[in-house]
């Protein structure tokens, strides 16, 4: 008698669209070659009732809902609290992604240490390390409270039972790709497993009021591995960025139901763990060369925080038939657009040159306010002149060569003044909001040509 073939379905890894057959292009998100085959998960945990534990299935008046139990918890790190919107919201689900070795587990262990020392019940669940390995890493970051609960488990049924029994205030899952739901007939890390496991954990977090952190692996493109629907299910998505071989780390929010997604947190990796960088501008500008052409300081605003960064450019005669153009730390297409503006509007010949643009320190910034800085760095390199070290610039550049206004100009100027800069080149449209700032020279410009002339003085 022939064995009964298990029914399979196809899922889009980008948006979670489900299909009975493979498709080249997803009808949901229009992406190509994103479908993977998985066993049909129907009849599993997603079908066995979706009522969250501890919640009644009846409507409640909005005015009758108490907010006293939902005060935010401090993580002990101001940088992390800033990105989260002021701390951890009770019952929230936070997904943290990043490259291997970037520091995801380290920062969560430091958060667990602070919360456990503050008297909260904290459960750290690892599917990747043994208890001894976790303790070794904990010893590296300092003394940890004996009340911190550790568990090495990947079976979701056992994890659910322990969470319901312990009722922790905060729970860490490291990582979601190692969790295994017995009711889903596929391997750990598959689309079905990740989706179903996240759904079960979300019900626990919302029903029991457990604040949950989930660690997610990332793909080579930098997105969290697994279905895109994973990012839609959680409340907050954070990405840890930075070069593993350098000491700095950038924590950036890309989704936050309880705060802004424009904030960043800056950390430095040391032997004792991650340390907050309270003054990122000073940190980013350390080691800047003196009297070097192709270098300029610009200002980018991430959320409410102005950050001064060094933009470097190198322009030289091409070695091969086709000019080589690269951009590190900023948008490549934007750099090409700005080079076209330079050639057309300012008469700077770049067609026969190789051009390299870099945001020093490895940080990635894409704000339009950096346009003027990129242009001046390119001109400084191709004409081989030095922009004074005490000059800071910002402004968006249009296709006609005009310098357009940007937001939070006053905060940018104040940051430059605080760090000892004496001159700021800024859009003339922003001059009124900055005029009252004393102790620093403000040079308003309307066009790129004016900015180039002022940068030589």
Give the predicted meaning of each segment.
Residues 99, 127:
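P-loop (Walker A) phosphate-binding loop of NTP-binding proteins
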Residues 122-126:
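Conserved RecA-like ASCE P-loop NTPase motor core of nucleic-acid helicases/translocases
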């Amino acid at each position: 008698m022939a064995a009964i073939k298990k029914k399979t379905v196809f899922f889009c890894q980008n948006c979670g669209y489900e299909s009975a057959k493979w498709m080249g292009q997803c009808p949901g998100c229009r992406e190509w070659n994103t479908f993977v085959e998985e066993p049909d998960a129907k009849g599993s945990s997603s079908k066995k009732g979706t009522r969250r534990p501890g919640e009644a299935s009846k409507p409640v008046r909005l005015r009758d809902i108490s907010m006293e139990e939902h005060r935010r918890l401090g993580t002990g790190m101001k940088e992390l609290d800033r990105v989260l919107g002021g701390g951890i919201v009770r019952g929230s689900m936070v997904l943290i992604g990043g490259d291997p070795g970037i520091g995801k587990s380290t920062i969560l262990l430091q958060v667990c240490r602070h919360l456990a020392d503050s008297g909260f019940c904290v459960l750290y669940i690892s599917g990747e390390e043994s208890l001894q390995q976790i303790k070794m890493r904990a010893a590296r970051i300092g003394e940890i409270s004996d009340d911190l609960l550790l568990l090495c488990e990947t079976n979701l049924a056992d994890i659910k039972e322990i969470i319901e029994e312990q009722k922790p205030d905060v729970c860490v899952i490291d990582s979601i790709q190692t969790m295994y739901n017995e009711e889903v007939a596929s391997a750990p890390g598959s689309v079905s497993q990740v989706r179903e496991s996240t759904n079960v954990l979300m019900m626990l977090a919302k029903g029991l009021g457990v604040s949950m952190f989930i660690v997610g692996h990332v793909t080579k493109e930098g997105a969290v591995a697994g279905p895109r629907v994973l990012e839609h299910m959680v409340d907050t998505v954070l990405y840890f960025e930075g070069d593993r071989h350098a000491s700095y780390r950038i924590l950036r929010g890309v989704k936050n139901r309880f705060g802004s997604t424009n904030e960043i947190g800056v950390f430095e990796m040391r032997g004792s763990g991650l340390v907050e960088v309270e003054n990122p501008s000073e940190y980013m500008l350390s080691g800047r060369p003196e009297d070097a052409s192709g270098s300029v300081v610009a200002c980018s605003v991430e959320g409410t925080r102005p950050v001064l960064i060094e933009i470097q450019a190198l322009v030289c005669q091409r070695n091969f038939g086709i000019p080589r153009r690269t951009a590190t730390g900023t948008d490549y297409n934007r750099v090409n657009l700005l080079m076209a503006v330079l050639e057309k509007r300012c008469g700077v010949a770049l067609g026969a040159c190789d051009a390299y643009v870099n945001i020093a320190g490895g940080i990635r910034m894409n704000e339009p306010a950096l346009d003027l800085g990129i242009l001046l760095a390119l001109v400084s390199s191709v004409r081989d002149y030095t922009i004074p070290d005490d000059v800071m610039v910002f402004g968006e550049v249009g296709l006609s060569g005009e310098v357009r206004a940007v937001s939070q100009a006053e905060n940018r100027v104040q940051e430059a003044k605080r760090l000892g800069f004496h001159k700021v080149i800024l859009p003339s449209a922003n001059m009124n909001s900055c005029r009252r700032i004393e102790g620093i020279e403000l040079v308003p410009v309307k066009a790129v040509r004016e900015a180039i002339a002022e940068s030589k003085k």
